Amino acid sequence: MKKLLLTIISSLALGGMATAQQTDAAVAAADTQPRKIISQQPDGELKEYYRTSTGYYNNFGTLTHVDVDGYVGKVVFDDRKRVYFYNIFSKVYNYAWLRGNIDGNIIRIDMPQAAYETLNLDENDRYYYTVYYANKVKVNDDGFELDSEKNYIELEVMEDGSIVQRGDDMIALCDENGDWLWYGDTHLNYQPFDSTIPTAPKTAVTEEWKLFSGNMAETVNVSIEGDRMYVDHINPEMPEAVAMGVIEGDKVRFATDQYLGQNGAYYSFFKSAVWGEIYDDRYDTYYEDYKATDEIVFDYDTARKRLKSSEAFLLNYGKSDVFYKIDYDKPSLKFIKTPTEATKPLGAEFVSVTPYSQSKGWGEAVFNLPQEDVNGDVLSPSQLTYQLYFDGELKSFGPDQYERLVREMDTFGYNFTDDWDIFVDGSKHTFYFYDDINTIGVKVINTFGGKSVESDIVTYDLATQTGIDDVAGSSRVTGVSYTNIAGCRVGAGTKGILLKTVTYQDGSTRTVKVAR
């Protein structure tokens, strides 16, 4: 066997290249090399499985492996005893099918097979493909070796219909010389999957509610039939996703691991959780993250139609591990009443303020604008505007300082953004300013039926930083850093499993695990 050279290619080197799937115009123009991957779904019977594996990937120069759970395993069986596996590499989306042959209940995937293509431009402005290949890599005490003598893996079709890899060798992504690129999967396991999304009966009473958590404010539909409550649109990317709860008096219980649908390459699940400290024995380190629970329980105010919980739920990839895209911590849901008059809105809540400095030439204010009035009733963002006050005076903003503005403005719509100095993310608003000021204030205005009602002006004192204490305690963030799980510091844009450390004004820190 040839000893495998571990060719370190960063995630940017592979991920930064345009794939043939992503650039149709460039594919049409390519003229120096025919395509070799199987990019179109082959003819035959398509089956979808719940896939698990161990996935290896290059985390900016660090070889990293993770347990992959809930991957959508697409497999095609044709009438010539051939079996095709789609996107067999969990950590590099290759838009390709690998072919195997089935004999009895054994599927054998012979390699090398073209598995990944990047589209490149040569010095003569001609497009060409660089092709990467699937090969078998053996894992042993010395590391990894390319198995050129028995370059295949086998999977067994079990009596229950599952497809399970034999042995623990890796199907790896290599260059044309057989050098491993630090992407691959082993312990492939395809389980039959037939879960369905809960559906509210047509006879259920359906109303619009608002789902709040942190700076998130999502409009959802709540349907009630008997002792069942159905909540849809909990994932903005998956409007079909529905979670079902059981009403028990003044409580509503939502069980964990409810199927929500496919989200990209993964099956998505509703997972209940609580925040806590977790020990990672692989790296002898503690970090804070969510711990899975059996259910999330909401307090239910039936008269005012409100739900509130001190726990959390996650929109999770897979159901075995905590691996989430969106988390709703301490969520609340409120019925959206039809307004009859303008009411006093809640005031702004400052998150952080960076004072203006001459060296940078700018300052930054981050604040939340609640979509509620002082009575706790939901307000539509379309009714809300806000104004900023610099050193106690209403500030007018114009194109002289804000190049993306086309006119002078002193009042902004709730969702206004110029995508340069003014940004909005849910209820969180970020505003860059170019004045050397001592205080900054925010006033919220609720307008309905031709009448406007204003909130109190919430002021942040940049000199003493007392304003933030009145609003958010000592939670001002002063720094954020990222490391990979091997302990190496990385940039905020790094893909993979990272540890995010947040440093607060009082010197305290909080470390969480994030997936990008």
Describe each region flagged by the PLM:
Residues 52, 57-102, 211-259, 392:
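N-terminal glycine/threonine-rich, aromatic-flanked beta-hairpin/loop signature
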Residues 106-199, 251-343:
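Beta-sheet ligand-binding and adhesion/scaffold domains
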Residues 368-406:
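Solvent-exposed loop/turn segments flanking beta-strands in beta-repeat/beta-sandwich domains
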Residues 3, 465-466, 499-516:
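C-terminal tail/sorting-segment detector
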Residues 339-354, 449-489:
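Residue-level detector of functionally pivotal "anchor" positions at catalytic/ligand-binding pockets or at interdomain
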Residues 431-451:
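Beta-strand-rich modules
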Residues 27-69, 85-89, 192-221, 232-233, ...:
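Tryptophan-anchored aromatic micro-motifs
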Residues 85, 231, 466-471, 486-487, ...:
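Terminal processing/anchoring signals of secreted or surface-associated proteins
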